[in-house]
């Protein structure tokens, strides 16, 4: 064993350094780059070029004529590409990196490769997992893969772009050469296109180098994504001519299922300040009626400038992969920022590869056919005629509203068109031209259609309501109404009740109290003398083709107003309820919650409806004529005098003449006439008469009682008492024919039974109590409910009734 000495160690180091310098001379690099290389950089580059040489030497030679392009021509083509070429193995080992990478990342190829021989050394650590997933995803060798990641850039470039550069990678795996190493590490060749907001300048608006060497077309949009300019290459991917798409809304080409995703990214682009970008994976409709997956990258050129979009046509599998990646990034951003309510990238679950590749038969209509999706409560919209000649936009873009062409439109519509604006990010699609860009209103915007109306609720873009506000691009707008609906608040009524209303603690969203609503005209017809249920009224309004409804009747859905005065006058016109107030307090009952437009017709309440404030006898259909009322009063007086006569013996005058007829009534039958020698009437304790006026329940035509029933009531009570001495054996004391009266010989038991019978309550008297039940409002509370024990000479009660 030889002991290492100082001289031997130095000799070995010198030998290793000499070999490294020899390797440096073999590297295909410029002399200027070789001078800057360290020993570690030289060894790293040597490994890369060795793997590259082995792979291409053992691979299958390219088919085709040799000498078609020279080496210099190939280098020129690679240098002209709008990106750089990248070759690496499945485990991430680099094989090749083109020289053009320095134009996009700021680093030269030598600087990047010198950092390490793995692709993970030159990409952002946050995207390592994405690249690993793409490299391990099983698929056929000829299947393209498309994903995006961020590459490290130089310090100077990072200062300009505020971070690493986002790069779109498209590539595929190649057949590996023979060998165990290549069998486990297939080679992936990719073209990397930096996603730049300002690609290399091309000759005017036509195709530039980016569109020549990459499947891509560019477009410029207004703030509402109306197309201002588009590349001619759109003809290749969508089949449209450039002139056919100018002044059209970009939303008109979108698939209905992608509206929410696109609008959310559009809002994010407009809401954030600075140099930001928005990404989306959507389906655009081709001229043939099919759908093409497009990866869109949008940049805003300042707060007043237009929006630039780079559109990359992708396959179904690439769309599925990109959607997964975008969704995962949004989820991670929400977790890091601690904001779970981030903008959703996609409204629904991520589509599978089969769903992306399969054609949806529901959306295969031709381009010329109307394309729309019906919403339950959305108003119908009208289509602008395609034959209308609309002005072309000038080169100096003006983002103010455009006027409608003159025509036989109502003056109301012309007046409304000046106040209505198009709120981004939604622009309705009108096939007639670009007049819709800045002059039509939102379909769900709350607007009161009155001739002098200037009320307009500007819809602020919200992340939670985009999917509810967006309608398909071919949706049509209705003509404004020339008169308000029946029961709908007008501008005058809105101002009147807003001045008289104050907030209340009780909340009734989307509804108005009947006392605060002002109706255009009274409902006086008998057909309207009945309350219309809300569901019936709402359905009736929906069935009307010429009526539109605001989403809410209240101008501010977060505030509810109630009248300042008490609610007593409200209850004067409504039926009584257990919670009806008596002292003017406001007691509100719960109202049903209805989604959508609320329109309820409230006609006048019938005049004769029972209320606590008015006695039933005072209502119109309870009135009697003067003659009928006089007859009823005389009958009551006669019954009262008959009841008083039972408490004292009949006098001689009464015995000789009988009862005098009262009030012109015919005299009673002779069977009731008693002689002076007769016995007195039984002194029975009769049950006090209840003085509730229940006569209004009877039919006025059959109100008068005949004399015969009155005789039957007092027949047995007027017979003489056998216990008194009134001349035994007197023939006058006997009844007709000499037969004794049936009440002559009564035992004490029979006498007690008659007393009980006189005080017995019938079933009707027992059921009708003098006092109301608990929780029951006595509708007849103004009538006297106290029991009267005696009557005056004139027949009135002991105490006044009212």
Swiss-Prot record:
InterPro entries registered for this protein in UniProt: bHLH_dom, bHLH_NPAS4, PAS, PAS-like_dom_sf, PAS_fold_3
Domain PAC: 278-317
Composition skew (Polar residues), residue ranges: 466-476, 506-518, 532-555
Impact after mutating residue 147 to S: Decreased transcription factor activity due to impaired interaction with ARNT2
GO biological process terms held by the UniProt record: cell differentiation; cellular response to corticosterone stimulus; cellular response to stress; excitatory postsynaptic potential; inhibitory postsynaptic potential; inhibitory synapse assembly; learning; long-term memory
CDD domains associated with the record: bHLH-PAS_NPAS4_PASD10 (cd19697), PAS (cd00130)
Keyword RNA-binding applies: no
Region described as Disordered: spans on this chain: 466-485, 506-555, 717-749
Ranges for region Basic motif: 1-13
Consequence recorded when altering residue 257 to K: Decreased transcription factor activity
Limits of the PAS domain: 70-144, 203-273
Post-translation changes: Ubiquitinated, leading to degradation by the proteosome.
Reported impact of residue 777 to I: Does not affect the transcription factor activity
Tissues expressed in: Brain.
Listed GO MF terms: DNA-binding transcription activator activity, RNA polymerase II-specific; DNA-binding transcription factor activity, RNA polymerase II-specific; protein heterodimerization activity; protein-containing complex binding; RNA polymerase II cis-regulatory region sequence-specific DNA binding; RNA polymerase II transcription regulatory region sequence-specific DNA binding
Residue ranges, annotated region (Helix-loop-helix motif): 14-53
Pfam hit, one: PAS_3
Predominant subcellular localization, coarse grouping: nucleus
Outcome following mutation: residue 296 to R: Does not affect the transcription factor activity
Compartments in which it is found: Nucleus
Signal peptide span: none
Function summary: Transcription factor expressed in neurons of the brain that regulates the excitatory-inhibitory balance within neural circuits and is required for contextual memory in the hippocampus. Plays a key role in the structural and functional plasticity of neurons.
Protein name: Neuronal PAS domain-containing protein 4
Organism: Homo sapiens (Human)
UniProt lineage: Eukaryota, Metazoa, Chordata, Craniata, Vertebrata
């Amino acid at each position: 064993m030889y002991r290492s000495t100082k001289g031997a160690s130095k000799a070995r180091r010198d030998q290793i350094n000499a070999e490294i310098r020899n390797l440096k001379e073999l590297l295909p690099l410029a002399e200027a780059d070789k001078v800057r290389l360290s020993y570690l950089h030289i060894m790293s580059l040597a490994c890369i070029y060795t793997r590259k040489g082995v792979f291409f030497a053992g691979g299958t030679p390219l088919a085709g004529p040799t000498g078609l392009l020279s080496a210099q021509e190939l280098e020129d083509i690679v240098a002209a590409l709008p990106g750089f070429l990248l070759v690496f193995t499945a485990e991430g080992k680099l094989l090749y990196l083109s020289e053009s990478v320095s134009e996009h990342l700021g680093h030269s190829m030598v600087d990047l490769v010198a950092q390490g021989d793995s692709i993970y050394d030159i990409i952002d650590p946050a995207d390592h997992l994405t690249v690993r997933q793409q490299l391990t995803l099983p698929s056929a060798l000829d299947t393209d893969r498309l994903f995006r990641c961020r590459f490290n850039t130089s310090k100077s470039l990072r200062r300009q772009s505020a971070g690493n550069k986002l790069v779109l990678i498209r590539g595929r795996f190649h057949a590996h050469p023979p060998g165990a190493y290549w069998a486990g590490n297939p080679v992936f060749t990719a073209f990397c296109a930096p996603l730049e907001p300002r690609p290399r300048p091309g000759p005017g608006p036509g195709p530039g180098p980016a569109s020549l060497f990459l499947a891509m077309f560019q477009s410029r949009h207004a703030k509402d994504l109306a197309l201002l300019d588009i590349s001619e290459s759109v003809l290749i991917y969508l089949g449209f001519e450039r002139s056919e798409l100018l002044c059209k809304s970009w939303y008109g080409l979108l698939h209905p299922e992608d509206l929410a995703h696109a609008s959310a990214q559009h809002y994010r682009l407009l809401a954030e300040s600075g140099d930001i970008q928005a990404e989306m994976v959507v389906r655009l409709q081709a001229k043939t009626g099919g759908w093409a997956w497009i990866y869109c990258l949008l940049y805003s050129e300042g707060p007043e400038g237009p929006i630039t979009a780079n559109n990359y046509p992708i396959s179904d599998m690439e769309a599925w992969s990109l959607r997964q990646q975008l969704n995962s990034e949004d989820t991670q951003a929400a977790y890091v920022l601690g904001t779970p309510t981030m903008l959703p990238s996609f409204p629904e679950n991520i589509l599978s590869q089969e769903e992306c590749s399969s054609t949806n038969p529901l959306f295969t209509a031709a381009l010329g056919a109307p394309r729309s999706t019906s919403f339950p409560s959305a108003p119908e919209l009208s289509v602008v005629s395609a034959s209308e000649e609309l002005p072309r936009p000038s080169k100096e873009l003006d983002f103010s509203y455009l006027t409608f062409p003159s025509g036989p439109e109502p003056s109301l519509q012309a007046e409304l068109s000046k106040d209505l604006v198009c709120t981004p990010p939604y622009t309705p699609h009108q096939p007639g031209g670009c007049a819709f860009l800045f002059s039509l209103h939102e379909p769900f915007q709350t607007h009161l259609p009155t001739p002098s109306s200037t009320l307009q609720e500007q819809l602020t873009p919200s992340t939670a309501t985009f999917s509810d506000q967006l309608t398909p691009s071919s949706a049509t707008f209705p003509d404004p109404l020339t008169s308000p609906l029946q029961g709908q608040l007008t501008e005058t009524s809105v101002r009147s009740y807003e001045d008289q209303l104050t907030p209340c603690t009780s909340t009734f969203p989307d509804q108005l109290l009947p006392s605060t609503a002002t109706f255009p005209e009274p409902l006086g017809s008998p057909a309207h003398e009945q309350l219309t249920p809300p569901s019936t009224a709402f359905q009736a309004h929906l069935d009307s083709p010429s009526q539109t409804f605001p989403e809410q009747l209240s101008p501010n859905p977060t505030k509810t107003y109630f009248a300042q005065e008490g609610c007593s006058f409200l209850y004067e016109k409504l039926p009584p309820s257990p919670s009806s107030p008596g002292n003017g307090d406001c007691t509100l009952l719960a109202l049903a919650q209805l989604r959508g437009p609320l329109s309820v017709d409230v006609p006048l309440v019938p005049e004769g409806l029972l209320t606590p404030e008015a006695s039933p006898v005072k209502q119109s259909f309870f009135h009697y004529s003067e003659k009928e009322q006089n007859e009823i009063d005389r009958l009551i007086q006669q019954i009262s005098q008959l009841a008083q006569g039972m408490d004292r013996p009949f006098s001689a005058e009464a015995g000789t003449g009988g009862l005098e007829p009262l009030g012109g009534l015919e005299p009673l039958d002779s069977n009731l006439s008693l002689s002076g020698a007769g016995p007195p009437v039984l002194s029975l304790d009769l049950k006090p008469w209840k003085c509730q006026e229940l006569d209004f329940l009877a039919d006025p035509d059959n109100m008068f009682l005949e004399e015969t029933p009155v005789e039957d009531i007092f027949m047995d009570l007027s017979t003489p008492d056998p216990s008194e001495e009134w001349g035994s054996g007197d023939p006058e004391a006997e009844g007709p024919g000499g037969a004794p009266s049936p009440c002559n010989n009564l035992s004490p038991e029979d006498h007690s039974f008659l007393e009980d019978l006189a005080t017995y309550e019938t079933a009707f008297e027992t059921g009708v109590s003098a006092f109301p039940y608990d929780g029951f409002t006595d509708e007849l509370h103004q009538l006297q409910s106290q029991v009267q024990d005696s009557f005056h000479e004139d027949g009135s009660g002991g105490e006044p009734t009212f």
